[in-house]
UniProtKB/Swiss-Prot annotation:
GO terms for biological process: DNA replication initiation; regulation of DNA replication. Residues 68-101 are annotated as: Domain II. It is found in: Cytoplasm. It comes from the Bacteria. Oligomerizes as a right-handed, spiral filament on DNA at oriC. It comes from Chlamydia muridarum (strain MoPn / Nigg). This is Chromosomal replication initiator protein DnaA 1.
Amino acid sequence: MRAWEEFLLLQEKEIGTDTVNKWLRSLKVLCFDACNLYLEAKDSFQVTWFEEHIRHKVKANLINNNGKPIRVRVTSLDKSTPFKESQIQQEKTAYFTMQYGDIDPQMSFANFLVTPENDLPVRILQEFAKVSEQGKGFPFNPIYLFGPESSGKTHLMQAAVGILREAGVKTLYVSSQLFTEHLVSAIRSGEMQRFRAFYRNVEALFIEDIEVLSGKGATQEEFFHTFNSLHTEGKLIVISSIFAPGDLKAMEERLISRFEWGIAVPVSPLTREGLKSFLERRIEQLNIRIEETALDFLIQALSSHIKSLLHALTTLAKRVAYKKLSHQLLYQGDVEALLQDVLQAAEHIRLTPSGIVRATAQYYGVSPENILGRSQSREYVLPRQVAMFLCRQKLSLSYVKIGEVFSRDHSTVISSIRAISQKLDEDDRESDVSCGVQELTKRLSSAYQSLDLIVD
């Protein structure tokens, strides 16, 4: 249909031909009846992408010959038949009946190892929980915690949530991904009023990984109004991210400014010694005995990733109990034997140059061979430069070593990395480079999520 094709041409100018071809032209036109356009996506992920990135543009730009807006309905290939009433009802009520975010009772302030590096965020969150528990206002709202993966942000947030709930404060604890999924579901089922009531009729909102909203205009718009509603009523907001507010890419300036209204607190990861002390305390709680060099080996094998280490120790305790070895001192050989599957998985997903190349290729929709090849097409040059930049940033590889990986001389590597750095310094949060680097950084920082599933 002409209106749809004109809309696609407009989007090519705004978001690029490659993106349109990948996400929009692959949508199948099922039917058009002057005021309604029915599209079929290949899967539910494409539907979600459409709702996040295109829905608001459709409302503004897709008009029929009579000047009336065209309503677009998108279903996925595996759900191309109309929804049954029961399916619609289930989608409508799924998040309204959800518990207000499960927390781990082990993640308390008492179980958090306080070090000079993280003393400030601990004191702030403790004071926040104490004041809020007593029904008093806290001088900083919102509290914005930022720091790398496994620095303790989740632990601190859950500790504060636990205290507030014990005091009867209605506290919602969610991830940004869950907020996004709830929003998409509400849009599709026509339940936006109930969605807004669910998120705004609380006394405190804790939301993790706010960088997940980067590049998602519709979700940012809704969160902006959610934030304003809560803040205006003096309700408490705590946010976490791997990025400081000013370092968020593809995030609306008005949101960033609001994140800075209260206090932004860096959360530093434990030092090697602090991590070891923390794990030793956990080992004692699990009633197992591990020889010091065996613990050092485990820390090294799991790259000091605290969440994976905690899961591994829990798994070890279960297997020790099963084999009735609770009173036996475990040496490195014992740990290797008891956690063989865990250690093999860790080795498989260890961050390497080839892993960065694969992740970059997947993000940009090209093959690793394209990135490592000789083509100078922009379709391949940009992913190649980003991959080089990430090898430098994440692995601290020398220019010569990166050149060996990509079969380039070191001067080419330097110019490629410099090109990406300059584009990032331009501070265009909506650029392909900024969005790509931020999303890949998040994915690579979360590389051990699959390991966590293995050792649960």
